[in-house]
Regions:
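Active-site/ligand-binding-proximal alpha/beta "capping" segment
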Residues: 200-224, 228
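Glycine-/charge-enriched secondary-structure boundary and capping motifs
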Residues: 2-12, 18, 23-27, 36-56, ...
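A generic local secondary-structure boundary/capping motif
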Residues: 58-60, 68-71, 107-109, 142, ...
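Glycine-rich anion-binding loops of enzyme active sites
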Residues: 74-90, 95-98, 114-207, 211, ...
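Small-aliphatic-rich amphipathic alpha-helix that forms the alpha element of a beta-alpha
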Residues: 93-119, 136-147, 222-234, 246-252
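N-terminal glycine-rich anion-binding loops that anchor highly charged ligand groups
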Residues: 19-20, 33-37, 59-81, 109-116
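Acidic-glycine-rich active-site phosphate/pyrophosphate-binding loop
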Residues: 69-80, 220-226, 291-301
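Short pre-catalytic strand/loop immediately N-terminal to key active-site residues, enriched for Gly-Thr
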Residues: 94, 211-220, 236-237, 307-311
Length: 346
């Protein structure tokens, strides 16, 4: 819009602007006591003897840092709740809206659910940026939600120093078929459904304004089809790869499941332009923080720094990392019994 560059109005960009994972875990430490006394997550609720509705039961809370919270509201129905928002990741307002909404919807797909309703979350510097630009952002979010068959039912807005946009999304799922981070079992292959590298390219875009259509294609592609295929394949362990990078999300899944995740670095798909950008040094601070967080728990073998930084690249609206094989998507490693490190690079 008239040469306006949205990325210049925020210090971070996309999921790279998340609070660093180590700091986030310290922040949340001790705030999960309520979940500690909850019944076994995958046990069925006690039957009602009075005919009254069954009381909701928390199935997935904050204990493992899963993609969304899940509560059982009936014998065969669970409700998924998530929220996600961030600063501009691209300069075009409409495209930013599409990416932010696609990213928010992904948390429901990552749990094996179906989005049923979304509400907008908007922070806007109205004295700096015209509201007509905010309208374009919201229109982009609406277009992404429509593509997902998910109505946008309102939202909340505040004035702020930097623009922020995203969505709170509600979804539904079969409680017996949830996909969670703590169910990876040794002997299963590891699948990744989107290539890495959008964080590197977003960093370069913010610096130069150069547009990378391949990165936009990745970030605006819904994880719906991959989620549906994962459920059909009986997969029960997985997560989406976003701000903590492939290494960070693999570490969290391995830690929650008590296993080692082995990644064959040569088999990990990476956008070719991102390889060139990484070699030129266009790595975000968020990606470096991701690597520093995972490094004490990982065996990187002979992998060089450029490779490990790409694997730690902070993704925005990335693909699904699944413990299981999904036709049409690359197998990038396997789940092993715990071998002293949560992540093993080969």
């Amino acid at each position: 819009m008239n040469g306006l560059r949205m990325t210049q109005y925020g210090r971070g960009g996309g999921c790279a602007c998340k609070i660093p994972p180590g700091e986030l875990e310290t922040l949340l430490s001790g705030l999960t006591d309520a979940a500690a006394d909850a019944p076994s997550p995958f046990s069925s609720p006690a039957p009602s003897t009075s005919g009254a509705p069954l009381a909701p039961r928390l199935l997935v809370g904050p204990e493992h840092g899963d993609d969304a919270a899940v509560v059982r509201v009936g014998p065969s129905l669970a409700v998924i709740s998530t929220a996600d928002f961030f600063t501009p990741v691209v300069d075009d307002p409409h495209t930013w809206g599409r990416i932010a909404a696609t990213n928010a919807l992904s948390d429901v797909y990552a749990m094996g659910g179906t989005p049923v309703m979304a509400i907008n979350l908007l922070a806007w510097p109205r004295e700096t940026l015209p509201l007509e630009i905010a309208r374009e952002v919201l229109r982009g979010g609406l277009d992404a939600a429509r593509a997902a068959g998910c109505p946008v039912a309102g939202g909340h807005s505040v004035e702020a120093a930097e623009p922020l946009y995203g969505m709170a999304v509600t979804g539904t799922a079969d409680p017996e078929r949830l996909i969670t981070v703590d169910r990876a079992e040794p002997g299963t292959p590891l699948t990744l459904t989107k290539p890495l590298g959008v964080g590197v390219l977003n960093t370069l875009h913010k610096k130069t304004g150069e547009v990378f259509p391949e990165a936009i294609e990745v970030m605006t592609t819904l994880n719906r089809d991959a989620s549906t295929a994962a459920l059909a394949a009986g997969i029960r362990a997985g997560t989406d790869v976003t701000g903590f990078g492939l290494l960070g999300h693999a570490h969290r899944m391995a830690r929650a499941s008590g296993v080692t995740v082995a990644i064959d670095t040569a088999r990990v798909p990476v956008i070719e332009a991102a390889r060139r950008a990484a070699a030129a040094g266009h790595i975000s601070g968020g990606s470096r923080r991701n690597l520093a967080w995972v490094a004490p728990h990982a065996d990187v073998g002979a992998a060089d720094e450029e490779t490990t930084l790409l694997l730690a690249d902070a993704q925005t609206s990335g693909g699904l990392l699944l413990a299981g094989e999904l036709p049409g998507h690359p197998v990038i490693g396997e789940v092993l019994p715990y071998e002293g490190s949560t992540v093993l690079l080969r």
